[in-house]
Amino acid sequence: MSTNQIILTDQGDNYVNVWSHVAQDLYNHYGETLYNSWFSKVNFIESSLNTVILCAPTNFVRDWIKSKYSMVILQLFQHYNNTIKSIEIITKELPGITQTVIALPTKTFADIGSSELNAENIFSTLDVRFTFDNFVVGAPNELAYAAARAVAESSGAVSESNPLFLYGGVGLGKTHLMHAIGWYIKQNNPSRKVIYMSAEKFMYQFVKALRNKEVISFKEKFRSVDVLMIDDIQFICGKDSTQEEFFHTFNTLIDNNRQMVISCDRSPSDLDNIEDRIKSRLGWGLVADVHSTTYELRLGILESKIEQMNVKIPKDVIDFLASKIVSNVRELEGALNKVIAHSNFTLKEITLENTQNILRDLLRSNERIITVEDIQKKVASRYNIKLSDMSSSRRLREVARPRQIAMYLSKALTPKSLADIGKKFGKKDHTTVMHAIKKVEELLENDIELREEINLLMKILQN
């Protein structure tokens, strides 16, 4: 963790030192990605009447910290100094920090000379089903939703989250949010130039431009927009030429205060076969994780969809779908559509028994199959370590112990052999896995807290 810039005031060094401890505790508790997104640019300003005043870099960061972390921060301050009664988080320009905004020369679509860049064609790539109005918000996606709204509502200026990096599994709503940003801008600020595109299509158009000697037109197309949204950026991993072009496009847009929104199936730090300089830039702004859906969120999604379709579905059927279709939102909505279509075509009433029969094959595929990769991701997240640490040889206790726990769970919850498990952990041999399992078993005999922790991890993975 890099050391924060500390601003000394006439209140003395005491509160400054306390803030440095609090910042370290936040880093240790929440991990590098979340710390860098929210706390790394927060500074101690002063203290007044037992109130600590902190400064956040933007209104968005200030409001999010206030709503989510203010009580935790206060408790940490009080742990080190019990005279502190409250905290206040403000935003203001700090002395010595200046912002330079370089405006791009304004171009119209006609200036660019590409039929692909007229507004009608750009917005024709957006799915009419994906708007903010029909996006169901819950705990797993509330940060991503709030950040996407902030980008869309930035009224022509760059948002406070630039770039916005959305990551998570398939079918959890990343693409929905990107389309929603596009539609919001179309309806409220149609003069802004927006491109939404998959990383695969970006690569295809770049290769085509190289072949047709139209690279200059390609560069103008992507570097003159107000908002560039690239979906599934992991596709350019290992594609050196495309990475190089993306790197320069990224720099041009960010340097000229243009907005970028990027989606991926993993966090920037977990991307393989991509240049470090690109990894670094992807994490410059706000990194928002879209988690797997909870039962409550799935229930909300189904109820919203049913209301939109103006159909009647028995409550026990809705509960059944929310409980059994747990993989992703796309499959959940597909299951609902299948049940409704079957009823419309056969004129049969929608009942729980009929639903179970209609979705028999889908339900079988949704039975929970736990993989070593699932275990590694969940344990890494639980202990705030990088996923790459699972296959590393680092021996620090804070890395080695979670890795041993993941090996133990892999043996307990999957049919994999010790040798197969070892391959998943950086090609370690079976004796290393055996030693890890034995070590955890020994600890479990006397460590009640660890026993409860592993039981909790098992329940999370199995459900």
From Swiss-Prot:
Keywords attached to this entry:
ATP-binding, Cytoplasm, DNA replication, DNA-binding, Lipid-binding, Nucleotide-binding
Protein's GO biological process: DNA replication initiation; regulation of DNA replication
Q: Which domain of life is it from?
A: Bacteria
Q: Does the keyword Nucleus apply?
A: no
Which sites bind ATP? 171, 173-175
Query: Region entry Domain III, AAA+ region: which residue ranges?
Result: 125-343
Q: Where is this region: Domain I, interacts with DnaA modulators?
A: 1-83
| Disulfide-linked positions | none
Compartments (UniProt record):
Cytoplasm
- What PROSITE patterns does this protein map onto? DNAA
Known Pfam families for this protein?
Answer: Bac_DnaA, Bac_DnaA_C, DnaA_N
Say yes or no: keyword Metal-binding present. no
For molecular function, the Gene Ontology terms on record are: ATP binding; ATP hydrolysis activity; DNA replication origin binding; lipid binding
InterPro entries associated with the record: AAA+_ATPase, Chromosome_initiator_DnaA, Chromosome_initiator_DnaA-like, Chromosome_initiator_DnaA_CS, DnaA_C, DnaA_dom, DnaA_N_dom, DnaA_N_sf
Instruction: Give the region (Domain IV, binds dsDNA) as residue ranges.
Output: 344-463
**Region listing for Domain II, in residue ranges:** 83-124
Q: Where are the transmembrane segments?
A: none
Q: Which GO terms describe its cellular component?
A: cytoplasm; plasma membrane
HAMAP family tied to this protein: DnaA_bact
Role description: Plays an essential role in the initiation and regulation of chromosomal replication. ATP-DnaA binds to the origin of replication (oriC) to initiate formation of the DNA replication initiation complex once per cell cycle. Binds the DnaA box (a 9 base pair repeat at the origin) and separates the double-stranded (ds)DNA. Forms a right-handed helical filament on oriC DNA; dsDNA binds to the exterior of the filament while single-stranded (ss)DNA is stabiized in the filament's interior.
Annotated domain remarks: Domain I is involved in oligomerization and binding regulators, domain II is flexibile and of varying length in different bacteria, domain III forms the AAA+ region, while domain IV binds dsDNA.
Known partners and oligomeric status: Oligomerizes as a right-handed, spiral filament on DNA at oriC.
UniProt lists the family membership as follows: Belongs to the DnaA family.
Record protein name field:
Chromosomal replication initiator protein DnaA
